[in-house]
């Protein structure tokens, strides 16, 4: 963060993926009326339930220094149609970069782990090409990869936000439909609902997703 503080056009981004389960209940403490403790009911999925049991989600915790010298922070989320793979990672980064550019940023210091969909040839090739075009055109946000040590997810500050988020969206007595769970998560993180990653959508020419995936 000290490095970002000396470069006002840089942003620090902590990226990670998480599964939001419709069944698993988080451990939590809660206030309750005397003699009426909160009880989390174990849920089951009906055979005709069309929704998946868990929803995969990409997240980027973005930190930067505001003009007044204070640290600013926000979290961006995108749910996935399926599971995290290289193509979804590329789509997520391609979505984040214009948002950073609109905020006046020129570089993203991207901190993430060594998941296969982060370090794949497809993702690394896309980042190289993306940075090449940013340099050639003088427009856009350059991405600087910063990998976390292997098997050290606790070093990513977005991890505790996932844990707190799961406590905030819990429903004690009924099974949440996928759409309602997504809405609750977005409300908990104060971010708008977006289309699922992985759905067909037009992309700019330089953001075409390579065929290779993790």
Task: Enumerate the language-model features and the residues they cover.
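Acidic/histidine-rich, metal-coordinating catalytic segments
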Residues: 16, 105-119, 148, 156
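Extended, low-complexity cationic-aromatic segments
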Residues: 1-95
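A short acidic (Asp/Glu
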Residues: 23-26, 120-124, 158
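C-terminal anion-handling pockets and recognition modules
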Residues: 9-10, 142, 151, 155-214
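Short, basic/hydrophobic alpha-helical segments
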Residues: 88-109
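RNase H-like polynucleotidyl transferase catalytic core
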Residues: 36-48, 130-160, 173-175
